[in-house]
Structure formats: C-alpha cells, structure tokens
C-alpha cells in the first residue's frame, strides 16, 4: 500500500501545480470566440470515394490545444468513405491559442470538412 502512496502524492502535487486555466477546456460559443486559424490543409479526396461519386460534409468536434494545434478530433456526422481524409486534414490545422484570463486554454469547436466532386 505504501508503494502506491508516493506516486499518487506526486501525481496529485503535479496536477495541483498546473494553473486552473491550463486545465480548462472551453467550448467555443457565446462569449468565447473561435480561435483564428493560421494553417489550413485541404483534405486529400480518396480515389475510392471519387469513383463511387461520394461527396458531402464531414462534421467534427476539434479540440485545439494550448499551443494552437489540434489535439483531438471526433467525427460527429460521418461519411464513412471520407472520415479518415477529414481527420487527417484537421489534425494538420493550426490556430492562434485561445486565452482565458491571459492564459492559453484548450477549446473545443465544431468544424466542417467539405468534399465536392469537380
């Protein structure tokens, strides 16, 4: 039992030493503006989807980390043949970090990735 106490105490102290703002994940909306995008990568349209005539919009929730990169993305509205390409693109997007009380915070926002056949 004592072997667990020390690592647990260290973990608790480490967690408590992180500023509250750094632990907060804020959803964009209301008074919280979406972060400004500084890099956008278009998705690579899968050949299989092109041949099948599949097009549409994949909707995702993207978590933007305190450094401005996408740290998590979850598909909300799926188009199975296009989901992987949408996720691959979104994970390359970059944003200016969002500040809360002067400290960078993670934000969650809904993003769309359009696939249009030409």
Regions found by a protein language model. Name each.
Residues 2-118:
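Charge-biased low-complexity segments
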């Amino acid at each position: 039992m004592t072997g667990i106490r020390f690592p647990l105490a260290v973990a608790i102290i480490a967690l408590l030493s992180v500023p509250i703002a750094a632990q907060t994940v804020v959803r964009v909306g209301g008074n919280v503006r979406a972060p400004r995008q500084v890099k956008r990568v278009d998705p690579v349209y899968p050949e299989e989807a092109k041949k099948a005539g599949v097009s549409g919009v994949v909707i995702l929730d993207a978590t933007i980390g305190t450094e401005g990169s996408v740290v998590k993305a979850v598909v909300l509205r799926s188009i199975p043949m296009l989901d992987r390409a949408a996720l691959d693109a979104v994970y390359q997007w970059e944003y200016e970090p969002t500040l809360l009380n002067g400290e960078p915070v993670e934000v969650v926002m809904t993003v769309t990735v359009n696939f249009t056949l030409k």
